[in-house]
Amino acid sequence: MQLFYVPLLSLFVLFVSLSFYFLFYKSKSGSTSGLPLPPGKTGWPVIGESFEFLSTGWKGYPEKFIFDRLAKYSSNVFKTSLFGQPAAAFCGAACNKFLFSNENKLVQAWWPDSVNKVFPSSTQTSSKEEAIKMRKLLPNFLKPEALQRYVGVMDQIATKHFKSGWENKKEVLVFPLAKNYTFWIACKVFVSVEEPTQVAKLLEPFNAIASGIISVPIDLPGTPFNSAIKSSKIVRDKLMGIIKQRKTDLGEGKASPTQDILSHMLLTSDENGKFMTEGDIADKILGLLIGGHDTASSACTFVVKFLAELPEIYEGVYKEQMEIAKSKKAGELLNWEDIQKMKYSWNVACEVLRLAPPLQGAFREALTDFSYNGFSIPKGWKLYWSANSTHRNSEVFPEPLKFDPSRFEGAGPPPYSFVPFGGGPRMCPGKEYARLEILVFMHHVVKRFKWEKVIPDEKIVVNPMPIPAKGLPVRLFPHKA
């Protein structure tokens, strides 16, 4: 669908005044330090190299945009233009360390305008400002004692999920099921919604949001971007209904002040004694639900893919998980101690995250002029770090395309080289939460089934996460009792 709009947008660009291009780049792209700008090109006026950046992902090779330019310019920093902004790509562990270490000093988080349009704030603040506020609210729900409580909740939901979606099926589509699993957990943990029909009503528009949040920003009927904007409003309206009902339930003593993040938001004031409005809370819950299931659903899907392709790896995971399963009494839930025993399984999951990182990279914005590696970076430039620049680098990970969980034994990879969750102050606060979801999923799927891929050479597309083009259909072989 996105490729259909490439010629449409290109025709539009032909009518954009070139004077804007020269004004924009002459005023914002020049070096003021005497040092040269990084090597590279800025592509077409206004749209820059955005189509090349996005289309390599649509074709299943997101790393190609990065590695082609690294080879061409022989530099770990190169200039480009993405989403209408002058930009520089920072590639490699040293670059990651520099960006992550200078958060809120030389650089700050930045999202394309499309993100703010899909997630408009009721308070007219940016997605970046909302994210900062959200990080202040999350620690109580992501600290170890809280995470320990979630293991049993995730185990219960996983049992229901596999019973309804996998058992007594000859074939299943893994990616939609993985999204259902992680979204079900997010709904339960964040807003105490767990009834399957309610979860399904929220999940459908969320799928449209995920497909359009980082897309060609054409707000016309039928485009992914337009669908994402409409779906965001639908979800927000549904959340407003949930929030209003919770306020009533709290007032009548029918809900607990500590049962989930929603209750906490309703009852917690800021440093000035001001409470969040219902609209504020809906905005934040919307962002949490997106972040709380997308990363893990992609990871769970690729766990199934790689275990189907690598029977020796499957056997290692199966052995570890069955030892845990056999130690449990009938009906006994998984607990924190069980999770800590899943060492090989987590090494496997980490290797999956290395080869198919859900977070392909992220943007920063230069807060001031600065220099790096002999190049000038002007204030306002957007800076993109890429997970694949280290994950698939043979100098960091020998034989980078080989699946090898032993890379994560002992001390593991060098610092700043394995970055599926980002790094520094902006490292995903839900990293440990996602780890629990993934490991609970692995426990349930391998103790029930072996499987094989229905489409051996199924294409992978990245938009913005890696996704099997056909949803990863697999043929199930239940274990004999």
From Swiss-Prot:
Disulfide bonds listed in the record: none
Keyword Repeat belongs to the record: no
A single Gene Ontology CC term: membrane
Gene Ontology terms for molecular function: beta-amyrin 28-monooxygenase activity; heme binding; iron ion binding; oxidoreductase activity, acting on paired donors, with incorporation or reduction of molecular oxygen, reduced flavin or flavoprotein as one donor, and incorporation of one atom of oxygen
Cofactor(s) recorded in Swiss-Prot or TrEMBL: heme
Record EC number: 1.14.14.126
Transmembrane segments: 4-24
Entry superkingdom: Eukaryota
The keyword Ion transport is annotated on this UniProt entry: no
Record: residues binding heme: 428
Originating gene: CYP716A94
Biological source species: Kalopanax septemlobus (Castor aralia)
Record-stated family: Belongs to the cytochrome P450 family.
Principal subcellular localisation of the protein: membrane
Keywords from the named record: Heme, Iron, Membrane, Metal-binding, Monooxygenase, Oxidoreductase, Transmembrane, Transmembrane helix
Subcellular localization: Membrane
Protein's UniProt name: Beta-amyrin 28-monooxygenase
Catalysed reactions, semicolon-separated: beta-amyrin + 3 reduced [NADPH--hemoprotein reductase] + 3 O2 = oleanolate + 3 oxidized [NADPH--hemoprotein reductase] + 4 H2O + 4 H(+)
InterPro entries linked to this entry: Cyt_P450 (IPR001128), Cyt_P450_CS (IPR017972), Cyt_P450_E_grp-I (IPR002401), Cyt_P450_sf (IPR036396)
Topology relative to the membrane: Single-pass membrane protein
UniProt record, GO biological process: saponin metabolic process; sterol metabolic process
UniProt enzyme class: oxidoreductase
